[in-house]
Each structure stands twice: as structure tokens, then as C-alpha cells.
Amino acid sequence: MTQVLKGLRVVEHGTFITGPAASMMLADMGAEVVKVELPGTGDPFRAFKGGLYSPHYQTYNRNKHSVALDTRKPEDRETFDRLIEGADVYIQNFRPGFAEQIHAGEARLRALNERLVYCAISGFGQDGPAAGRPSYDTVAQAASGYLRLLVNPANPRVVGPAIADAMTGYYAAFGILGALFERQATGRGRKVEVSMFEAMAHFNLDAFTHLFSVGEVMGPYSRPSVSQSYVLECACGGWIALHMSSPEKFWQGLANAMERPDIFEDERFASRPGRIANQDALIELLGGIFKSRRRDDWCARLVEQDVPHAPMYRTDEVPEDAQAKHLQLFVDTHHPVMGDSRTVRSPLSFDGQRSLDVAPPPTLGEHNALYAQGWPATQAHDIKKETA
């Protein structure tokens, strides 16, 4: 595989998702990432299902090394400082002010390494009236207005994965790469800051654009209505998702697949504005038709007519999808102690080369000896060869 960030050294002082997700993005592209964790307990995500190797922890910690250090202790701080002196990037996702308490604030680390790109991830920003508040995924989704677009008012429940956590980490990685690019010209590092609140507000850009442009406050069904998106149950109990968008050819294809060319004779459904205005009636019509055939039958018909669709899979169905297999989307890893595991590879390919070689998440302090004196003498320690 192509490791476009090979030679880049990253120290991650992260917990849960945002910090670990940021460094995972860099590790997936070949960066050497050392995860600094508290001795004994490590990243709190480790213990979410008992033990210290939960699936929650595994999700965002592949392709990394782990060292157990308490930077409040002078002897551990010496090792930490050696890592910082040789690092390109430092990532933390503490509440504002806590990094300074554990001797990992920007000013101190910058004195050790002026080329260091220092990334600070927070819930609400480094200053301001909400800066000190605790924040987790749902908090950021709610504060940014995004959660209001997901929750069904008739049955208000938080749904879905930790989007705010993951997206904040991905934005952080994006900012880090920008600072590294600038450093090539200046020779100096930058402080990169991103908060979950800001990240999710930006991720929710469409809703704010509608607000500021036309005064529309979007709700859960605003975008699906305009994009003409539907989820429909089939005779077998499986579901299909359609996203018809604007081109009329897709609607003609759907009518052909349903063997219902007469659908356009109804003025409510004859045009895009009509279909949007009469969405509930259209969903009722489509729902009745789709319950007449099995999902596989519908998929074959929709493929033949070039209609934008996909089976609405359960997670356990996705690995069996023919395209997922073709793309080698799921890869196996092996840890000498924890055994075999499977994960989703990086979605990025470079010159057609996919990231198929993935190192398993490390056990707590697994690489203490390797980094006891700082970075190994080689330019970049190949974690993938080590775990092969």
C-alpha cells in the first residue's frame, strides 16, 4: 500500500473519539502514531465492555502504538518530552486548561519543539462563556442544530452513531495537514484548534445556508422532501432506499420498474414540484407498490432501469454485498495477544492502491519499551510489519 504520510511522527494524547479519530486518519495514511495513555486504565473507551480492549476502543485506534505515561510524574514526563522533541504533531482533546495541568500545554511543548503542530480539540472552544462545559457527541449535535434534523418529533429519541465525535476528529486531521503544508515554507508549527460545536455547525452548513438565504428553518423532513428520498418496505420485510433527485429520467425509470407508467397521469405526481407538495400521498402510493415484491426483485428491476437506490442493509448484511467484496472494504487483522479482528479499511486509494494492511489496535502500554528513550533510531517504525 502507499503510505503518503510515512515519516510523519504523531503523539496522540486522546480519549474516547475526537482525538483518536484525528490520529487514526493520519495513521491510516502511514503516519507513525504513539498513543499516550494513563498507566493502569488507559483511554476510558478501553473499558466500555469490560477489560481493556472494547470494540469502542478498537474502532478508532488501529495502526497505532501505545505507551503508558503519567505526565504528572517527572520520570514519565522525561519520556514524554523526548517524544515531543522528535514529533511533528501533538493531538489532545482535553477540556481547555487541563493540558497545562498535566504539563502538556502548547507553550511548554512549543519550547521543546518549535516545529510542532499542536492540535487542541474541545467541546465548545478554548474560550468564551461555554468553553468550560463538558461535551459529548449528543451535546454537540444538539448545540449545532443538527440533532433537531434527526429526531422524530412524534417519538423523540437520540438516534444513530457518534457523528459529532467522528466528524470533529476528521476536521482536526484536515487542519493538521494544512498546518503541516504551511510548515514546509515557514519551518514553524502552528496551533490547530477545533471544537465539536464549530465542527458540527459547519457539517450542518446546508441548514444555515437555507436560514440565512431564504429564512427557512429546516426540519427532519426538509431535505428528504426536496431531494425526493424515500425508504420503502418490501414483501420480504427488507427495505430499499430511493434518492430520486431532480432528473425526470429517474422517475420514468421508477415507473417502468413498477410497471406503473400511469403514475404521471396523476397531476400530483406529474412534476417535481407536485411530488414535493404531495410527498405523503406519494409515499403511501409507493409503499403499497413496493410491498408487492421482494427486495431482491425490486433491486434487479431498479438496476435495469438505472434508478438511484440501495438496499437499506443492516450492518451485518453489508460485508456480503458484492461491491463491498470487490472493493475489499473489510480487512482482517491479527494481534498476537488479542487475536483476530476485522475492520473497515480507509476509504482512500492512491494510484489504485487500497489500504489493505491494517495493524490491530494496541494493548495498553504495549510499546513502552520501544519508546522508552524517545523515537526509535529509524526514520519511521513500520507498525504494519511489526504485527504481520
Label each residue range with its predicted role.
Residues M1-A185, G215, T363, H367-A388:
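N-terminal helix-loop segment corresponding to the beta1-alpha1 unit
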Residues G40, F124-G125, M196-A201, C236-G238, ...:
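Glycine-rich beta-alpha junction loops
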Residues A154-A164, E233-G238, Q353-L356:
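Flexible glycine/proline-enriched surface loops and loop-helix/loop-strand junctions
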Residues A162-L177, M196-N204, S246, F250:
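Mid-domain beta-loop-alpha active-site segment that forms a flexible
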